[in-house]
Curated annotation (Swiss-Prot):
<keyword id="KW-0793">Thylakoid</keyword>
<keyword id="KW-1133">Transmembrane helix</keyword>
<dbReference type="InterPro" id="IPR010010">
    <property type="entry name" value="PSI_PsaM"/>
</dbReference>
<keyword id="KW-0812">Transmembrane</keyword>
<keyword id="KW-0150">Chloroplast</keyword>
<feature type="transmembrane region" description="Helical">
    <location>
        <begin position="7"/>
        <end position="29"/>
    </location>
</feature>
<dbReference type="GO" id="GO:0015979">
    <property type="term" value="P:photosynthesis"/>
</dbReference>
<keyword id="KW-0603">Photosystem I</keyword>
<keyword id="KW-0602">Photosynthesis</keyword>
<keyword id="KW-0934">Plastid</keyword>
<comment type="similarity">
    <text>Belongs to the PsaM family.</text>
</comment>
<dbReference type="Pfam" id="PF07465">
    <property type="entry name" value="PsaM"/>
</dbReference>
<dbReference type="GO" id="GO:0009535">
    <property type="term" value="C:chloroplast thylakoid membrane"/>
</dbReference>
<keyword id="KW-0472">Membrane</keyword>
<dbReference type="GO" id="GO:0009522">
    <property type="term" value="C:photosystem I"/>
</dbReference>
<protein>
    <recommendedName>
        <fullName>Photosystem I reaction center subunit XII</fullName>
    </recommendedName>
</protein>
Length: 30
């Protein structure tokens, strides 16, 4: 199923983006 792979890829990218933003804010606050 192509849709499932696309959904998983989107979810992983979205999660990675949020983690990157949180990490960036944490480093910026220090």
């Amino acid at each position: 199923m192509v849709e499932l792979k696309f959904l998983i890829a989107f979810f992983l990218a979205f999660t990675a983006g949020i983690l990157a933003i949180k990490l960036g804010q944490a480093l910026y606050d220090c």
